[in-house]
């Protein structure tokens, strides 16, 4: 008999998928009518809410009772703006502006990625330039005040919601299916926008902290859970911390056969573009010492996801690790004291890794990982290039994955009875 949490996750995926598909079809068919109707429904909700507060105020405790003039003010404002064409147009333009801004954002990411690939003579790279041109073109066209691009952008949004809904429906309908993927082929998955999934690691941490504050006597139960008795062959760590914005977005690395493999911009002397670009550095470290360093140095919380692999998947991952090994050049971090981002003068983080976590560090002789870029050739892409050999889903056709996107996928896999993820731990 399936667990309640599994049943909930299954029907949640189906419900979200159906909702996204229906909304997508409505946007494709009716265009601007849908957001305008949504605006009116929102104003109608505010009006009814104000009326309800007005009718029930005499039954409420005086301390919780809203000031009658505030309630009347809400009612009057909602009634006045309910059918305001100007405000409807403003809300519609704001929606289009957000979509166009996201297109410009992803277009710039593609352009920077293409530029780095070109500098490092990486092929293929033309698709990144193509993505940059059409995404920036769409964004500039839609954000221009000289014409109305609302229907065009809503059409694109509708098709995006159809694909997003299809991914959710597939998750729901095949939730309990035992995967049979002998060729370890990867399936395409449509995910939420980067600016949404970027908040998942810190959001998960805050939920954990809230849970712990209410269950102090059972704190140990949160730190480790297993779905079944299958062995854990590979771990994926998702880090997050509330100490800075970049740490809040998270970091991803993997642990295979007791060794942590991580990738990032660990050479501060090579950093540029506000620290977003730098030489790509890979390190291998002792698992236990690395976890302790992360908790001590940056006050990080690590969410560890354990994957159970078949012999075929292990062989594919080991082959990929061997490919990466051929690209590595040993690198020694400087022992010189430097001013860190936190403002402290101390050894670089890469030097601490070497001294405190028994890490060996490397740079890349070639490949897309020669230069690190926080929004494309980042820690998640390196981890995914390894774990993906086990047949996990492709989370971005463009290769832009943030830690939150990966964590969302791993959490979903854990809820599936036959999913790849068999354990979750928190450090």
Cite the ranges covered by each PLM segment.
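Membrane-proximal helix-loop-helix units in multi-pass membrane proteins
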Residues: 82-126
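Glycine-rich catalytic cores of cysteine/serine-nucleophile enzymes that process amide/ester linkages
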Residues: 229-326
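Juxtamembrane "helix-exit" motif on the non-cytosolic side of transmembrane helices
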Residues: 26-33, 58-59, 82-90, 114-117, ...
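Helix-boundary/low-complexity linker signature
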Residues: 15, 24, 33-36, 43, ...
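Activation targets extended, charge/polar-rich intrinsically disordered C-terminal tails
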Residues: 17, 36-39, 43-51, 56, ...
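Membrane-interface segments at or immediately adjacent to transmembrane helices
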Residues: 181-246, 250-252
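Conserved, well-structured beta-alpha core segment at the onset of a catalytic domain
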Residues: 94, 106, 113, 125-129, ...
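Membrane-anchoring hydrophobic segments
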Residues: 1-83
């Amino acid at each position: 008999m399936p667990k309640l949490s599994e049943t909930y996750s299954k029907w949640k995926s189906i419900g979200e998928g159906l909702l996204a598909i229906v909304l997508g079809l409505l946007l494709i068919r009716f265009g601007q009518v849908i957001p305008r109707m949504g605006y009116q429904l929102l104003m109608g909700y505010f009006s009814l809410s104000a009326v309800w507060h007005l009718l029930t105020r005499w039954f409420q405790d005086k301390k919780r009772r809203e000031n009658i003039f505030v309630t009347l003010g809400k009612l009057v404002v909602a009634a006045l703006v309910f059918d305001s064409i100007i405000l409807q147009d403003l809300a519609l333009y704001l929606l289009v502006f957000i979509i166009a801004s996201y297109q410009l954002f992803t277009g710039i990411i593609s352009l920077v990625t293409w530029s780095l690939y070109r500098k490092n003579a990486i092929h293929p790279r033309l698709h990144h330039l193509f993505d940059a041109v059409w995404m920036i073109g769409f964004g500039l066209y839609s954000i221009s005040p000289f014409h109305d691009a609302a229907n065009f952008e809503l059409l694109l949004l509708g098709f995006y919601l159809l694909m997003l809904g299809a991914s959710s429906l597939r998750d729901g309908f095949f939730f309990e299916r035992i995967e049979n993927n002998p060729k370890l082929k990867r399936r395409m998955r449509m995910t939420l926008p980067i600016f949404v999934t970027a908040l998942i690691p810190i959001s998960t941490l805050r939920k954990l902290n809230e849970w712990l504050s209410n269950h102090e006597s059972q704190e140990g139960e949160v730190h480790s859970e297993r779905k079944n008795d299958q062995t854990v062959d590979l771990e994926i760590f998702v880090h997050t911390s509330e100490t800075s914005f970049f740490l809040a977005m998270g970091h991803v690395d993997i642990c295979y056969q007791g060794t942590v493999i991580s990738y990032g911009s660990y050479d501060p002397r090579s950093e540029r573009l506000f620290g977003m670009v730098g030489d790509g550095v890979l390190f291998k470290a002792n698992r236990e010492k690395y976890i302790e360093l992360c908790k001590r140095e940056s006050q990080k919380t690590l969410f560890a996801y354990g994957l159970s692999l078949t012999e075929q998947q292990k062989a594919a991952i080991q082959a990929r690790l061997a490919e990466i090994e051929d690209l590595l050049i040993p690198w020694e971090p400087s022992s010189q004291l430097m001013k860190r981002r936190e403002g402290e003068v101390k050894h670089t983080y890469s030097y601490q890794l070497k001294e405190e976590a028994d890490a060996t560090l490397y740079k890349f002789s070639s490949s897309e990982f020669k230069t690190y870029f926080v929004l494309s050739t980042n820690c998640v892409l390196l981890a995914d290039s390894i774990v993906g050999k086990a047949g996990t889903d492709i989370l971005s056709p463009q290769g832009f994955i943030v830690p939150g996107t990966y964590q969302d996928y791993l959490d979903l896999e854990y809820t599936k009875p036959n999913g790849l993820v068999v354990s979750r731990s928190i450090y």
